[in-house]
Curated annotation (Swiss-Prot):
Gene Ontology BP, a term: iron-sulfur cluster assembly
Bound cofactor: record note: Binds 2 iron ions per dimer. The dimer may bind additional iron ions.
Job description of the protein: Is able to transfer iron-sulfur clusters to apo-ferredoxin. Multiple cycles of [2Fe2S] cluster formation and transfer are observed, suggesting that IscA acts catalytically. Recruits intracellular free iron so as to provide iron for the assembly of transient iron-sulfur cluster in IscU in the presence of IscS, L-cysteine and the thioredoxin reductase system.
Protein name: Iron-binding protein IscA
Statement: the UniProt record of this protein carries the keyword Hydrolase: no
Record family assignment: Belongs to the HesB/IscA family.
GO molecular function: 2 iron, 2 sulfur cluster binding; metal ion binding
Family matches, as SUPFAM superfamilies: HesB-like domain
Endpoints of the signal sequence: none
Cofactor(s) demanded: Fe cation
Domain of life (superkingdom): Bacteria
Length: 107
């Protein structure tokens, strides 16, 4: 399955990396958080870890560690604008439920 990225999300990641002036990609991971247990984490990557998996689409690298991949396999990362708000949207087929505020999820 892997990780997929929409073209809009890829354009946004490229813009962030260009503005930053360095980096080989964006790390997508999970951490323990919120009332449902897990939350998504996005951070810039300058150096790969030996166990990282790299998913490339539209010229953008999404980097995932093996522990997070268990929860993220099959996810699509999108970038959406809804009214005055804009940001990354996670379309994760593994999510069984998420908290009311949308901060965390459970698989």
């Amino acid at each position: 399955m892997g990780i997929t990225l929409t073209e809009k999300a890829a354009q946004r990641v490229k813009a962030f990396l260009d503005n930053r002036g360095k980096g080989i990609g964006l790390r997508l991971g999970v951490k323990t958080s919120g009332c449902s247990g897990l939350a998504y984490v996005l951070e810039f990557v300058d150096v790969l870890n030996s166990e990282d998996q790299v998913f490339e689409q539209y010229g953008v690298n999404i980097i995932v560690d093996p522990k997070s991949l268990v929860y993220l396999n099959g996810i699509e990362l999108d970038y959406v604008k809804e009214g005055l708000n804009e940001g990354f949207k996670y379309n994760n087929p593994n999510v069984k439920e998420s908290c009311g505020c949308g901060e965390s999820f459970h698989v």
